[in-house]
Each structure stands twice: as C-alpha cells, then as structure tokens.
C-alpha cells in the first residue's frame, strides 16, 4: 500500500511538473535534500587529472545508469526526482568525457525489458524523456554534441519519436562529440536485426555469402551511427554486475568497471577511479601474450 502511494505521488509530481517548474530542477532546487552535484564535473579542455594519461583515454565509454530509483528512495525524494537527478548526472558525465578527449559516450537509458515495469512508471519515463530531450536541443547545439538515439523506436510515444527526430536532425553535423542514447534497446534484437538485414540484402543480390565478415556485420548493427561502435570501457553503477542485454556484440573486448555507487552519486572522482582502473589494465583482445 505504501509503495503504491509513493508511486502515485511520483506520477502526480510529473503531471504538475509543467505548471510548477521546469522538467528538471535548477541548480540548488533540491536544497535540504542530499546534494547531487558533489564532485561536479569541471575540467578544462587542456587539463587532465594527474592520475590519468590522456593518450590512454578510451575512445568510447558506455554506461549503464543503475540506481536512480534506489537513490530517490534513500534520499526521501520521489521516483521522478531520482530520474531527474540521473539525467543531470549523465550530462555532467558526458561533458567531462568530451573534455578529456573521449569521443563517444553511450548510455543505456531504457531497455526492452523495462516495458515490463508498472505502466504508470513507464509512462512517467517516456514523459520525462520527451520533456528533457526537447528542453536540451539548444544545449547540445551550443556544445556541438551530436546525439543519436538507438533502439526499437516503434513502440515509443509519437511525441517522443518526433523529439528524437528533431534532436538528431539538429545535431547531425557535429563530429567530435557523440552521445548515444539507447531507448527500448535490446542487444539480442540488435543482432537479430543485423542478421535479417544481411539476409534481405543477400536475397536482393547486394551481397554474397563470402562478403559476410565481422566488418560487414557491424555495419548492420545500430551502433553503425558512430565511428567507434565497440566501447573500450563499460561502467555500471549501483553494485550490479551484469550487462542486462546491452551491446551483446559490441562488448566482446570491452573492459568492465562495476561501481557500488548509485548513478546520481557517481561523481567526478568516481569516474576518475574508473579511468585509472582502465588505464592500468593490459588489454589483450583475446590474445595470449
């Protein structure tokens, strides 16, 4: 009963959101609650933390942003505010990545399996996605960040789909910084879709059996939108140690970093710890040296 009451309060906050305040809180709006900007990501374009070597930075960092709901519950906030805090943290995280010379950031925002959550929660999430992405189009343009959204977008609400198309069109010319958002994404679905595309092209006489190799296959995956489709580093927060059907093909030789910290609390220092761990590893890509 209490959990349902909590959930209904979260929904009510979303319904009142456009009237009471912007979709995402301004800095300091969570005053008297647990602060989410501890360790705010501020680093100059030319500045690299002393613990890190810039030449060893990953080109593509993927993140599974786990723990937003638990963070909200622990801090006495509504579920919707937990997602808001997580979205704010993602922008800070991506901004630091780009300043450190990391070209591509991909974030697992909503899995295909997440449709199994309570319908009200899913509706809340879709509403938040649409409001947030719409409100940040000018921000992405000002930072010259290209945004791509991947996943089975056929099921998402029409309003969100229109915003996705608008955002991708507005940022498609930017080359140096690339943020990939996976919404209704499934690694299995991605691989299955690639197989179907190859079979279809084969039937049309566009490719032969001997043409099919890893390079051709990767061009049919949804990560073909980026120059670096395979992440060098995957970070998952909240202590969970699984990939949850994310980038099943692309993660073949990726280095993993699992953090016990909930995503809204994954600050600059925690990210530096992940990068230090990554840079100390001997990447072998399956070979025995």
Curated annotation (Swiss-Prot):
Q: Report whether Magnesium shows up as a keyword of the record.
A: no
Annotated transmembrane regions? 2-22
Q: What class of enzyme is it?
A: transferase
Q: How does it sit in the membrane?
A: Single-pass membrane protein
Q: Which prosthetic group or cofactor does it need?
A: Mg(2+)
Q: Name one GO cellular component term.
A: endoplasmic reticulum membrane
EC number(s) on file? 2.5.1.-
| PROSITE patterns according to UniProt | UPP_SYNTHASE
UniProt key word Transmembrane helix: yes
* MF term (GO), any: transferase activity, transferring alkyl or aryl (other than methyl) groups
Where is this chain's protein located in or outside the cell?
Answer: Endoplasmic reticulum membrane
Describe which pathway this protein belongs to, using the record's wording. Protein modification; protein glycosylation
Q: Which GO terms describe its biological process?
A: protein glycosylation
Read off the Pfam families from this record.
Answer: Prenyltransf (PF01255)
| UniProt keyword annotations, A-Z | Endoplasmic reticulum, Membrane, Transferase, Transmembrane, Transmembrane helix
Which Gene3D superfamilies does the record match to this protein? Decaprenyl diphosphate synthase-like (3.40.1180.10)
Which InterPro entries does the record associate with it?
Answer: UPP_synth-like, UPP_synth-like_CS, UPP_synth-like_sf
Main location (coarse class): endoplasmic reticulum
Q: Which family does it belong to?
A: Belongs to the UPP synthase family.
Protein name in the entry: Dehydrodolichyl diphosphate synthase 4
């Amino acid at each position: 009963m209490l959990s349902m009451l909590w959930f209904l309060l979260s929904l009510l906050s979303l319904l009142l959101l456009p009237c009471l305040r912007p979709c995402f809180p301004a800095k300091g709006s969570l005053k008297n609650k647990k602060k989410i900007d501890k360790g705010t990501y501020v680093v100059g374009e030319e500045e690299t933390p002393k613990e890190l070597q810039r030449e060893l930075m990953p080109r593509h960092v993927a993140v599974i942003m786990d723990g937003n709901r638990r963070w909200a519950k622990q801090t006495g906030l509504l579920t919707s505010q937990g997602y808001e805090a997580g979205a704010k943290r993602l922008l800070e995280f991506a901004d630091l990545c780009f300043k450190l010379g990391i070209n591509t950031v991909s974030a697992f925002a909503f899995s295909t399996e997440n449709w199994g959550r309570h319908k009200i929660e899913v509706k809340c999430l879709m509403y938040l996605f649409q409001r947030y992405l719409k409100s940040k189009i000018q921000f992405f343009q000002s930072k010259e960040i290209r945004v791509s959204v991947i996943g089975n977008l056929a099921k998402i609400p029409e309003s969100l789909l229109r915003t996705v198309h608008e955002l991708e069109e507005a940022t498609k010319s930017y080359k140096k910084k690339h943020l990939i958002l996976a919404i209704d994404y499934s690694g299995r679905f991605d691989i299955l879709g690639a197989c179907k595309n190859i079979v279809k092209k084969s039937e049309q006489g566009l490719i032969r059996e001997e043409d099919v190799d890893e390079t051709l296959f990767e061009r049919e995956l949804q990560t073909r939108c980026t120059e670096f489709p395979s992440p060098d580093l995957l970070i998952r927060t909240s202590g969970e140690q699984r990939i949850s059907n994310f980038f099943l093909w692309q993660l073949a030789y990726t280095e993993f970093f699992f953090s016990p910290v909930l995503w809204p609390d994954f600050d600059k220092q925690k990210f530096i710890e992940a990068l230090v761990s990554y840079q100390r590893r001997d990447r072998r890509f399956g070979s025995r040296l």
